[in-house]
Amino acid sequence: MPATNDSRPTPPTDLPDAPEGVPRSVVVVGAGLAGAQTATALRAHGFAGHLTVLGEEGLPPYDRPPLSKELLTRREPLWLRDDLGIDLDSLADEVHLADPATALHPGPVVATRSGRSISADLVVLACGSRPVLPVGWEAEVLHTAADAERLRTGLRPGGRCVVVGAGWIGAEIAGVAAGAGADVTVLEADAAPLARQLGVEVGAHLVPWYAAAGARLRLGSAAAAVRRDGVTLASGEHVPADVVLAAVGARPATGWLRESLPPEVFDPVGALLVDAGGAVPGVPGVRAVGDVASRPHPVLGRVPGGHWSAALHDPDLVARAALGVEPAPAHAPYVFSRQLDHDLALFGLPTGAPSVWRGTPGDGPWAAFWTGPAAGGGTAGSAVVRAVLLVDSPRDVGAVRRAFNGPGPAHLDLTAAADATIRLRDALRA
C-alpha cells in the first residue's frame, strides 16, 4: 500500500456540505487497528468528507496479536487488508504511513514529523501504545513487526532466552520459544504470573504450565539491571542470556500530547479520559480511541483501552458519536491468549479474588468469575458479572460474549455457574 507524499493544502476547500456539528474533514492519527477501524466506521456511517490517516511505521495496517502468538510461524504481518478487508487507500483521501503526528494545536491542527500542518474539523487520536522499557535496560521488546523480526532472528534451538515479565506477552513468547527448542527462563517480580491482570490466586494456577511447556519460571525475581548478555537480579544473581525480552507492560502513546492537552484529561498511566463517544472533555474537535482512551462503561465503570477488542470495536462508537448516528451498546473488554499450550479468554475487568470457580484448575477446562451485587433485575442467588476468565473452554466464549455485550448487566446464577455439568450459557442471563 503506497503512502501519498503530496504537499497540497489539507483539507481542500471544496468539501461537501454537512449537517451542523458534523465534521467535513477528519484526521485519524494512527494507522493500526484502531485507526483503520475508525476510517472504516466513518465511511460506513456516511462520512463523505476529506479523510487523512497518519501512520508511523511505514507499513499498511496489520494485526498485532499474531506478532507473539505466531512469532515463529508467520514471517510477515497479518495485514488487515487480507484479514478484515480494510484498504486505507480506498477509504482515505490521504494516507501518510511514515509521517506520524508530533504536535496537536487548537483548531484542531496536527503537525507531523515531515513538517506538514494539517487542519481538520475533527482529529481522532488512535496512536496506540508503546512498550515499557525502563531507562538503562538493554533488551528486545515486542510491539511492532520490526520488533518481531529482530526477536525471531535472535531465537534459536539451545539458545538462552530470558523473558522479564510473566504477563500476556511474556507467557506467549515463553511458550513459543520453548516449543522451538530455546532454553527459556521467565523472571517475574510478583508472586504469580499474570498477577496484575488476574490476581495472585488465579495466577498461582498457571505456574505449572511453565514447567510443562519446557520453560523455567522464577517468581519474586526482580530485575536490577538488564543487559544484552543477561539480567542481574535484585539479589545480585546474574542470569545469562543470548536474547533478553522485556515484557513488562505498555503505556498509551500520548507523551507528544502533554503540552497540547490539559493535565486533567490524562489518567495516571497517560490514557485520555474520554466520554462514551470518545470526546476529550474541554478539547473541541478531538476524540480518542483504542489504547490511548479510557472510556466509561455502563457496568464496569472506567475501561482502559489496552485491549485488542477496544481497537476493534470502539471506533464504531466514536464514528457514530462524531456523525450524530444513534449509539450502539458498548463492548466489554476482551483478551484472548494462547500461552504455554493453553487457551485463555478474559471478559471484563477482574478486581480482587474470584467469587465463583467452575471446574478444577489443572484437571481440564475451568473458569473463574468476578461478580458484584445483583442489580437491574437480579434475583436471589444471582449476581452481576464483572469479569469471566475461561481456560481451555472455547465453546463457552460465545455465550459469555453475548452476555457481556448485551444492553444491560450480565447476571450469573451462582449455583449453576459452579456446576460444570450445567451448560454455562444456562447460568448466564443478559
Please place each PLM-identified region on the residue numbering:
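FAD-binding core/adjacent interface of flavoenzyme oxidoreductases
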Residues: 1-27, 86, 90-160, 234, ...
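Mid-to-C-terminal Rossmann-like scaffold of FAD/NAD(P)H-dependent oxidoreductases
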Residues: 9, 21-25, 294-398
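Beta1-alpha1 glycine-rich phosphate/pyrophosphate-binding loop at the start
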Residues: 12-93, 176-197, 399
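Residue-level detector of alpha-helix initiation sites
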Residues: 32-33, 58, 131, 146, ...
